[in-house]
């Protein structure tokens, strides 16, 4: 009896002990789970609490009006027609994707612009996809014009070198949005033009522009860009005390503090214009086998920027009748493309003979387009109505000449960099002087419109930006 009683007491105690352990485990597990959930919520906060996107620059865009000040419009970016035209500008759905390289937020509805789908934010190390491609490996000619309120880099008031023909604002142009467009390459982030760095790169050197009035357009742009970094304006002067006009063609501006000169020499064709006797009369001819008479002044330059194209579309050069001369021979008739190639071969021979590639960088700028509508420059052609860039390229005018230039450059011993500005300039019908190439008091009611040159500040600033990038990354 005594053994059985002792055994039943022990069984009861064991059972009670087991129940106590189970109860304690349940309580502990409940407490631990609650703590774990709280901990996880602190480790992974909601996207709204940690990530913010500033949508203020993104505004609804309709077909009826576009305000560059309101939104950074990307020219040649096309938007699908909105399914909902209520005008709401809120974000309806976010999808968050997190990876080791980047954070991508997909916005499915922003201001009813249903084609804007992805916004890419920088990765954790501060580099994005565009910067992965080195600028020297990037084709900066592929891109689009974007409206940038930080532009222009100078104004008609801050630059004293803009002649009347290019000073559109000074001549009364009121729509000034043409100044605010910046070219943005699609595959890389190009550093902005830095006037101080550019001056340091040409310290003690000669930067020489050679060509027609379109190259003078670019040269004046370069003077204006560089002048913004000069502390004392009196330390910049023209070495022959010449004032920039359309009449006088040769200039040399010295930047005293940098011991450099920025020069321009006018030549419409790079080869020699002259006169020869044809029958009983002396007529204008073009010596396609001889260099321009100013070529001796180009020697010794450290950076040479050439161009020719615009005057090759003139009626004299296009007709080619008793105009092109080689030696004593005046061609009764010569095709303009053949003459253009012969002239470039004369130029290329001069470069190969007179330029030392170890001391001089040579550039050739491609043709810049004209945008005449309704006629040519002397037959009622106009571009006054344009106040925005085109959303598609204008019909190319110099495609055949571009291929000739490329072929000639390939045959040269001296390395020559082609500054290809034709494509990006095609969009900018809005950036020509039009009727604003003269002062209002000198303007006739039926004045010829200038749809070939460019307002300053304007498109030539981008050409010089390309030149800057080549010098910066290929030193």
From Swiss-Prot:
Membrane topology: Single-pass type II membrane protein
Motif (DCXHWCLPGXXDXWN motif): 450-464
Main location: membrane
Motif (GDS motif): 211-213
Transmembrane segments: 14-34
Gene Ontology CC: membrane
Alphabetical keyword list: Membrane, Signal-anchor, Transmembrane, Transmembrane helix
Taxonomic path: Eukaryota, Viridiplantae, Streptophyta, Embryophyta, Tracheophyta
Pfam family membership, one: PC-Esterase
GO MF annotations in UniProt: O-acetyltransferase activity
Presence of the UniProt keyword Transmembrane helix in the record: yes
Record's protein name: Protein trichome birefringence-like 6
Miscellaneous comment text of the record: Contains 2 motifs that are conserved in esterases, but it is unlikely that this protein belongs to the catalytically active pectin esterases.
Family statement drawn from the similarity comment of this UniProt entry: Belongs to the PC-esterase family. TBL subfamily.
Organism for this UniProt entry: Arabidopsis thaliana (Mouse-ear cress)
UniProt-annotated location(s): Membrane
Function description: May act as a bridging protein that binds pectin and other cell wall polysaccharides. Probably involved in maintaining esterification of pectins. May be involved in the specific O-acetylation of cell wall polymers.
